[in-house]
Design a protein with these regions (language model features):
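Extracytoplasmic gate region of multi-pass secondary transporters
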Residues: 23-24, 206-249, 253-256
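Helix-breaking motifs and short loop linkers at transmembrane-helix boundaries and internal kinks
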Residues: 35, 67, 88-93, 238, ...
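Conserved MFS/SLC helix-loop-helix module at the cytosolic interface between two early adjacent transmembrane helices
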Residues: 54-93
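Helix-to-loop junctions at the C-terminal end of transmembrane segments
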Residues: 55-68, 148, 258-271, 349-350
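Helix-loop-helix hairpin linking two adjacent transmembrane segments in secondary transporters
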Residues: 94, 128-179
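Cytoplasmic helix-loop-helix junction between adjacent transmembrane helices
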Residues: 98-132
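C-terminal transmembrane helical hairpin of 12-TM major facilitator-type secondary transporters
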Residues: 269-313
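A late C-terminal transmembrane helix in Major Facilitator Superfamily
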Residues: 318-354
Protein backbone atom coordinates (compact mmCIF):
# COMPACT_ATOMS: atom_id res chain seq x y z
CA UNK A 1 0.00 0.00 0.00
CA UNK A 2 2.83 2.39 0.92
CA UNK A 3 4.66 1.68 -2.35
CA UNK A 4 1.51 2.22 -4.43
CA UNK A 5 0.88 5.56 -2.74
CA UNK A 6 4.51 6.55 -3.32
CA UNK A 7 4.11 5.84 -7.04
CA UNK A 8 0.98 8.00 -7.13
CA UNK A 9 2.85 10.84 -5.38
CA UNK A 10 5.68 10.53 -7.91
CA UNK A 11 3.15 10.81 -10.74
CA UNK A 12 1.64 13.87 -9.06
CA UNK A 13 5.06 15.50 -9.04
CA UNK A 14 5.40 14.89 -12.76
CA UNK A 15 2.21 16.94 -13.00
CA UNK A 16 3.78 19.68 -10.90
CA UNK A 17 6.68 19.90 -13.35
CA UNK A 18 4.71 19.82 -16.59
CA UNK A 19 3.65 23.52 -16.67
CA UNK A 20 6.86 25.03 -15.27
CA UNK A 21 9.14 24.80 -18.30
CA UNK A 22 6.67 25.50 -21.09
CA UNK A 23 6.69 29.29 -21.11
CA UNK A 24 10.47 29.56 -21.38
CA UNK A 25 10.64 27.14 -24.30
CA UNK A 26 7.66 28.64 -26.12
CA UNK A 27 8.43 32.31 -25.53
CA UNK A 28 10.76 32.88 -28.52
CA UNK A 29 7.77 31.92 -30.70
CA UNK A 30 5.05 33.60 -28.62
CA UNK A 31 6.28 37.17 -28.27
CA UNK A 32 6.74 37.86 -32.03
CA UNK A 33 3.26 36.45 -32.74
CA UNK A 34 1.65 38.69 -30.12
CA UNK A 35 3.80 41.68 -31.05
CA UNK A 36 5.03 42.32 -27.51
CA UNK A 37 8.51 43.00 -26.03
CA UNK A 38 10.68 39.97 -25.26
CA UNK A 39 10.81 40.81 -21.54
CA UNK A 40 6.99 40.59 -21.28
CA UNK A 41 7.49 36.97 -20.24
CA UNK A 42 8.35 38.38 -16.83
CA UNK A 43 4.71 39.43 -16.36
CA UNK A 44 3.55 35.84 -16.80
CA UNK A 45 6.23 34.34 -14.56
CA UNK A 46 5.61 37.05 -11.96
CA UNK A 47 1.92 36.18 -11.75
CA UNK A 48 2.55 32.42 -11.62
CA UNK A 49 5.16 32.82 -8.90
CA UNK A 50 3.18 35.36 -6.90
CA UNK A 51 0.14 33.10 -6.78
CA UNK A 52 2.36 30.15 -5.88
CA UNK A 53 3.78 32.16 -2.97
CA UNK A 54 0.28 32.95 -1.69
CA UNK A 55 -0.83 29.35 -2.05
CA UNK A 56 2.28 28.03 -0.28
CA UNK A 57 2.00 30.46 2.64
CA UNK A 58 -1.55 29.31 3.39
CA UNK A 59 -0.93 25.67 2.51
CA UNK A 60 -0.81 24.44 6.11
CA UNK A 61 -4.37 25.66 6.71
CA UNK A 62 -5.69 24.20 3.44
CA UNK A 63 -3.95 20.86 3.92
CA UNK A 64 -5.04 20.47 7.53
CA UNK A 65 -8.65 21.17 6.55
CA UNK A 66 -9.04 19.22 3.30
CA UNK A 67 -6.13 16.75 3.36
CA UNK A 68 -3.16 16.34 1.03
CA UNK A 69 -4.95 14.02 -1.40
CA UNK A 70 -7.96 16.24 -2.17
CA UNK A 71 -5.88 19.40 -2.40
CA UNK A 72 -3.50 17.68 -4.83
CA UNK A 73 -6.30 16.41 -7.09
CA UNK A 74 -8.06 19.78 -7.25
CA UNK A 75 -4.81 21.70 -7.80
CA UNK A 76 -3.62 19.42 -10.60
CA UNK A 77 -6.98 19.73 -12.36
CA UNK A 78 -6.76 23.51 -12.05
CA UNK A 79 -3.32 23.59 -13.70
CA UNK A 80 -4.56 21.31 -16.50
CA UNK A 81 -7.39 23.70 -17.37
CA UNK A 82 -4.97 26.63 -17.29
CA UNK A 83 -2.71 24.87 -19.83
CA UNK A 84 -5.70 24.30 -22.10
CA UNK A 85 -6.48 28.00 -21.81
CA UNK A 86 -2.94 28.91 -22.84
CA UNK A 87 -3.29 26.82 -26.00
CA UNK A 88 -6.30 28.83 -27.22
CA UNK A 89 -5.29 32.30 -26.05
CA UNK A 90 -4.96 34.96 -28.73
CA UNK A 91 -4.07 37.92 -26.50
CA UNK A 92 -1.30 38.45 -23.98
CA UNK A 93 -3.75 39.51 -21.26
CA UNK A 94 -5.32 36.03 -21.34
CA UNK A 95 -1.92 34.45 -20.69
CA UNK A 96 -1.59 36.69 -17.64
CA UNK A 97 -5.04 35.75 -16.33
CA UNK A 98 -4.40 32.04 -16.81
CA UNK A 99 -1.12 32.35 -14.92
CA UNK A 100 -3.17 32.84 -11.72
CA UNK A 101 -4.69 29.32 -11.45
CA UNK A 102 -1.40 27.89 -12.70
CA UNK A 103 0.41 29.41 -9.72
CA UNK A 104 -2.24 28.69 -7.11
CA UNK A 105 -2.29 25.02 -8.05
CA UNK A 106 1.49 24.65 -8.01
CA UNK A 107 1.93 26.07 -4.52
CA UNK A 108 -0.56 23.73 -2.88
CA UNK A 109 0.85 20.63 -4.59
CA UNK A 110 4.44 21.54 -3.78
CA UNK A 111 3.90 22.28 -0.08
CA UNK A 112 1.65 19.33 0.65
CA UNK A 113 3.61 16.59 -1.09
CA UNK A 114 7.01 17.81 0.08
CA UNK A 115 5.99 17.78 3.72
CA UNK A 116 4.25 14.41 3.36
CA UNK A 117 7.40 12.81 1.93
CA UNK A 118 9.68 14.54 4.46
CA UNK A 119 7.63 13.13 7.34
CA UNK A 120 6.86 9.63 6.06
CA UNK A 121 9.64 8.63 3.65
CA UNK A 122 13.44 8.62 3.41
CA UNK A 123 15.85 11.12 1.85
CA UNK A 124 16.22 8.91 -1.22
CA UNK A 125 12.46 9.07 -1.78
CA UNK A 126 12.56 12.87 -1.52
CA UNK A 127 15.25 13.06 -4.20
CA UNK A 128 13.39 10.61 -6.41
CA UNK A 129 10.24 12.70 -5.90
CA UNK A 130 12.00 15.76 -7.27
CA UNK A 131 13.55 13.61 -9.97
CA UNK A 132 10.02 12.94 -11.18
CA UNK A 133 9.43 16.69 -11.14
CA UNK A 134 12.46 16.83 -13.42
CA UNK A 135 10.79 14.32 -15.72
CA UNK A 136 7.78 16.61 -15.95
CA UNK A 137 9.79 19.72 -16.75
CA UNK A 138 12.00 17.76 -19.18
CA UNK A 139 9.04 16.34 -21.09
CA UNK A 140 7.36 19.72 -21.57
CA UNK A 141 10.11 21.51 -23.54
CA UNK A 142 10.60 18.34 -25.58
CA UNK A 143 6.92 18.38 -26.52
CA UNK A 144 7.25 22.09 -27.22
CA UNK A 145 10.30 21.55 -29.44
CA UNK A 146 8.27 19.07 -31.52
CA UNK A 147 5.45 21.60 -31.77
CA UNK A 148 7.84 24.41 -32.73
CA UNK A 149 9.30 22.22 -35.47
CA UNK A 150 5.79 22.31 -36.95
CA UNK A 151 5.66 26.08 -36.31
CA UNK A 152 2.88 25.92 -33.69
CA UNK A 153 3.59 26.55 -30.01
CA UNK A 154 -0.12 26.07 -29.23
CA UNK A 155 0.12 22.36 -30.00
CA UNK A 156 2.83 22.11 -27.34
CA UNK A 157 0.44 23.48 -24.73
CA UNK A 158 -2.33 21.14 -25.90
CA UNK A 159 0.00 18.16 -25.53
CA UNK A 160 0.94 19.30 -22.02
CA UNK A 161 -2.76 19.62 -21.16
CA UNK A 162 -3.39 16.01 -22.21
CA UNK A 163 -0.55 14.82 -19.99
CA UNK A 164 -1.84 16.87 -17.07
CA UNK A 165 -5.45 15.75 -17.36
CA UNK A 166 -4.36 12.10 -17.41
CA UNK A 167 -2.39 12.68 -14.21
CA UNK A 168 -5.47 14.31 -12.67
CA UNK A 169 -7.51 11.20 -13.46
CA UNK A 170 -4.90 8.94 -11.83
CA UNK A 171 -4.92 11.09 -8.70
CA UNK A 172 -8.71 11.12 -8.56
CA UNK A 173 -8.95 7.33 -8.70
CA UNK A 174 -6.22 7.01 -6.04
CA UNK A 175 -8.19 8.83 -3.31
CA UNK A 176 -9.18 5.59 -1.50
CA UNK A 177 -5.50 4.64 -1.40
CA UNK A 178 -4.66 7.79 0.57
CA UNK A 179 -7.35 7.00 3.14
CA UNK A 180 -6.08 3.45 3.69
CA UNK A 181 -2.47 4.57 4.01
CA UNK A 182 -3.42 7.33 6.45
CA UNK A 183 -5.31 4.88 8.67
CA UNK A 184 -2.40 2.45 8.63
CA UNK A 185 0.08 5.19 9.54
CA UNK A 186 -2.02 6.26 12.52
CA UNK A 187 -2.08 2.68 13.81
CA UNK A 188 1.65 2.05 13.42
CA UNK A 189 3.10 5.38 14.58
CA UNK A 190 2.42 8.04 17.13
CA UNK A 191 1.25 11.13 15.29
CA UNK A 192 2.91 14.44 16.18
CA UNK A 193 0.32 17.17 16.62
CA UNK A 194 0.94 19.85 13.97
CA UNK A 195 1.59 23.37 15.19
CA UNK A 196 0.77 26.32 12.96
CA UNK A 197 3.28 29.16 13.06
CA UNK A 198 2.49 32.70 12.00
CA UNK A 199 4.73 34.57 9.59
CA UNK A 200 5.87 36.77 12.48
CA UNK A 201 6.85 33.75 14.56
CA UNK A 202 8.88 32.29 11.71
CA UNK A 203 10.54 35.64 10.98
CA UNK A 204 11.78 35.74 14.57
CA UNK A 205 13.74 32.50 14.01
CA UNK A 206 17.20 33.34 12.55
CA UNK A 207 17.63 29.89 10.98
CA UNK A 208 14.33 30.26 9.14
CA UNK A 209 15.31 33.65 7.73
CA UNK A 210 18.59 32.18 6.49
CA UNK A 211 17.01 29.15 4.83
CA UNK A 212 14.55 31.49 3.12
CA UNK A 213 17.45 33.21 1.35
CA UNK A 214 18.91 29.85 0.32
CA UNK A 215 15.59 28.70 -1.10
CA UNK A 216 15.19 31.98 -2.93
CA UNK A 217 18.66 31.76 -4.49
CA UNK A 218 18.66 28.11 -5.59
CA UNK A 219 15.23 28.45 -7.19
CA UNK A 220 16.20 31.75 -8.79
CA UNK A 221 19.04 29.88 -10.49
CA UNK A 222 16.70 27.10 -11.59
CA UNK A 223 14.00 29.32 -13.05
CA UNK A 224 16.30 31.92 -14.55
CA UNK A 225 17.74 29.08 -16.61
CA UNK A 226 14.32 27.69 -17.46
CA UNK A 227 12.82 31.05 -18.40
CA UNK A 228 15.73 32.87 -20.04
CA UNK A 229 18.00 30.02 -21.12
CA UNK A 230 16.17 29.48 -24.40
CA UNK A 231 16.08 33.20 -25.25
CA UNK A 232 19.80 33.53 -24.36
CA UNK A 233 20.62 30.66 -26.72
CA UNK A 234 18.53 32.14 -29.55
CA UNK A 235 19.54 35.80 -29.27
CA UNK A 236 22.96 35.49 -27.67
CA UNK A 237 24.32 32.28 -29.18
CA UNK A 238 22.48 32.07 -32.52
CA UNK A 239 20.46 28.90 -31.85
CA UNK A 240 17.17 28.26 -33.66
CA UNK A 241 14.08 28.26 -31.37
CA UNK A 242 13.60 24.49 -31.72
CA UNK A 243 17.27 23.74 -30.98
CA UNK A 244 17.19 26.10 -28.01
CA UNK A 245 14.09 24.31 -26.70
CA UNK A 246 15.95 21.02 -27.03
CA UNK A 247 18.87 22.42 -25.01
CA UNK A 248 16.44 23.45 -22.27
CA UNK A 249 15.19 19.87 -22.34
CA UNK A 250 18.78 18.79 -21.65
CA UNK A 251 18.97 21.32 -18.82
CA UNK A 252 15.92 19.83 -17.13
CA UNK A 253 17.18 16.33 -17.88
CA UNK A 254 20.38 17.27 -16.04
CA UNK A 255 18.28 18.43 -13.10
CA UNK A 256 16.38 15.12 -13.06
CA UNK A 257 19.63 13.17 -13.33
CA UNK A 258 21.18 15.11 -10.45
CA UNK A 259 18.23 14.28 -8.23
CA UNK A 260 18.23 10.65 -9.30
CA UNK A 261 21.94 10.27 -8.50
CA UNK A 262 21.42 12.02 -5.17
CA UNK A 263 18.65 9.54 -4.38
CA UNK A 264 20.94 6.63 -5.24
CA UNK A 265 23.63 8.03 -2.92
CA UNK A 266 21.19 8.78 -0.07
CA UNK A 267 21.83 5.49 1.74
CA UNK A 268 25.60 5.92 1.54
CA UNK A 269 26.26 9.66 1.73
CA UNK A 270 24.69 12.05 4.26
CA UNK A 271 22.29 14.75 3.10
CA UNK A 272 24.68 17.58 3.96
CA UNK A 273 27.49 15.95 1.97
CA UNK A 274 25.18 15.57 -1.01
CA UNK A 275 24.34 19.26 -0.74
CA UNK A 276 28.08 19.97 -0.83
CA UNK A 277 28.46 17.84 -3.95
CA UNK A 278 25.66 19.83 -5.58
CA UNK A 279 27.38 23.12 -4.74
CA UNK A 280 30.60 21.85 -6.33
CA UNK A 281 28.63 20.85 -9.42
CA UNK A 282 27.13 24.34 -9.80
CA UNK A 283 30.57 25.89 -9.33
CA UNK A 284 31.87 23.89 -12.29
CA UNK A 285 28.74 24.72 -14.29
CA UNK A 286 28.91 28.49 -13.89
CA UNK A 287 32.60 28.37 -14.80
CA UNK A 288 31.78 26.54 -18.05
CA UNK A 289 28.57 28.38 -19.03
CA UNK A 290 30.13 31.61 -20.40
CA UNK A 291 31.97 29.48 -22.97
CA UNK A 292 29.62 26.58 -23.72
CA UNK A 293 25.87 25.93 -23.74
CA UNK A 294 26.56 22.54 -22.12
CA UNK A 295 26.94 24.56 -18.93
CA UNK A 296 23.12 24.66 -18.75
CA UNK A 297 23.04 20.87 -18.43
CA UNK A 298 25.69 21.07 -15.69
CA UNK A 299 23.74 23.76 -13.81
CA UNK A 300 20.74 21.44 -13.74
CA UNK A 301 22.89 18.50 -12.68
CA UNK A 302 24.44 20.32 -9.71
CA UNK A 303 21.69 22.66 -8.57
CA UNK A 304 18.94 20.09 -8.99
CA UNK A 305 19.77 18.14 -5.82
CA UNK A 306 20.26 21.08 -3.45
CA UNK A 307 16.59 22.04 -3.12
CA UNK A 308 15.10 18.58 -2.39
CA UNK A 309 17.84 17.75 0.10
CA UNK A 310 17.26 20.96 2.05
CA UNK A 311 13.51 20.35 1.90
CA UNK A 312 13.94 16.84 3.33
CA UNK A 313 15.95 18.23 6.26
CA UNK A 314 13.06 20.50 7.33
CA UNK A 315 11.66 18.21 10.09
CA UNK A 316 15.23 17.52 11.29
CA UNK A 317 16.28 21.17 11.31
CA UNK A 318 13.11 22.63 12.82
CA UNK A 319 11.04 19.78 14.32
CA UNK A 320 8.15 17.69 12.99
CA UNK A 321 5.43 19.67 14.77
CA UNK A 322 6.17 22.89 12.87
CA UNK A 323 7.47 21.32 9.66
CA UNK A 324 4.31 22.02 7.60
CA UNK A 325 4.32 25.73 8.44
CA UNK A 326 8.04 26.10 7.77
CA UNK A 327 7.78 23.90 4.68
CA UNK A 328 5.14 26.22 3.26
CA UNK A 329 7.24 29.28 4.05
CA UNK A 330 10.32 27.74 2.44
CA UNK A 331 8.43 26.94 -0.73
CA UNK A 332 6.89 30.42 -0.70
CA UNK A 333 10.33 32.06 -0.53
CA UNK A 334 11.60 29.63 -3.14
CA UNK A 335 8.92 30.94 -5.45
CA UNK A 336 9.84 34.48 -4.53
CA UNK A 337 13.11 33.61 -6.21
CA UNK A 338 11.14 32.28 -9.14
CA UNK A 339 9.10 35.48 -9.16
CA UNK A 340 11.99 37.93 -8.83
CA UNK A 341 14.78 36.36 -10.91
CA UNK A 342 13.16 36.35 -14.40
CA UNK A 343 11.94 39.99 -14.34
CA UNK A 344 15.18 41.10 -12.67
CA UNK A 345 17.20 39.54 -15.44
CA UNK A 346 14.79 41.09 -17.93
CA UNK A 347 15.81 44.51 -16.61
CA UNK A 348 19.48 43.55 -16.58
CA UNK A 349 19.34 42.25 -20.16
CA UNK A 350 17.67 45.46 -21.35
CA UNK A 351 20.49 47.47 -19.79
CA UNK A 352 23.50 45.25 -20.48
CA UNK A 353 22.36 42.76 -23.11
CA UNK A 354 21.35 39.10 -23.06
CA UNK A 355 25.02 38.07 -23.08
CA UNK A 356 25.37 38.76 -19.33
CA UNK A 357 23.09 35.82 -18.51
CA UNK A 358 25.93 33.53 -17.27
CA UNK A 359 27.24 36.26 -14.96
CA UNK A 360 23.78 36.76 -13.50
CA UNK A 361 23.78 33.08 -12.52
CA UNK A 362 27.23 33.43 -10.94
CA UNK A 363 25.96 36.18 -8.62
CA UNK A 364 23.02 33.99 -7.53
CA UNK A 365 25.37 31.06 -6.92
CA UNK A 366 27.60 33.14 -4.64
CA UNK A 367 24.57 34.29 -2.59
CA UNK A 368 23.33 30.71 -2.23
CA UNK A 369 26.71 29.32 -1.17
CA UNK A 370 27.40 32.03 1.42
CA UNK A 371 24.02 31.58 3.09
CA UNK A 372 24.31 27.78 3.17
CA UNK A 373 27.51 28.31 5.14
CA UNK A 374 25.71 30.68 7.52
CA UNK A 375 22.83 28.21 7.93
CA UNK A 376 25.14 25.33 8.88
CA UNK A 377 26.85 27.52 11.46
CA UNK A 378 23.50 28.57 12.97
CA UNK A 379 22.34 24.96 13.22
CA UNK A 380 25.58 23.95 14.93
CA UNK A 381 25.23 26.76 17.48
CA UNK A 382 21.62 25.77 18.24
CA UNK A 383 22.50 22.06 18.44
CA UNK A 384 20.22 21.11 15.53
CA UNK A 385 22.90 20.26 12.99
CA UNK A 386 22.84 16.53 12.22
CA UNK A 387 25.71 15.67 9.89
CA UNK A 388 24.45 12.08 9.56
CA UNK A 389 20.90 13.01 8.47
Amino acid sequence: MTILLLIVIYIAFIGLGVPDSLIGSAWPAIYPEFGIPVDSVSCVTLLVSGCTVLSSMFSDRLLNRFGTAKVTVFSTAMTALALLGFSVSNRFVFLCLLAIPLGLGAGAIDSGLNNYIALHYSASHMNFLHCFYGIGVSASPYLMSLALAENTWREGYRSAFLVQICITAILLFSLPLWKKSSAKAQESTEEVAPQTLSLKQMWQMPEVRTVWVIMLATNAIEYACGTWGSTWLVEGRGFTPENAAFMITLYYAGMALGRFLSGILANRVSTWKRIGIGILGVLIAVAVLPFSAIGLFLVGLGNGSIYPNLIHLTPVNFGESVSQSIMGSQIATAYLGVMVAPPLFGLVSNLLGIQVFPWFLIVLFVIMTVFIGIFVRQLKVSGRYDKTA
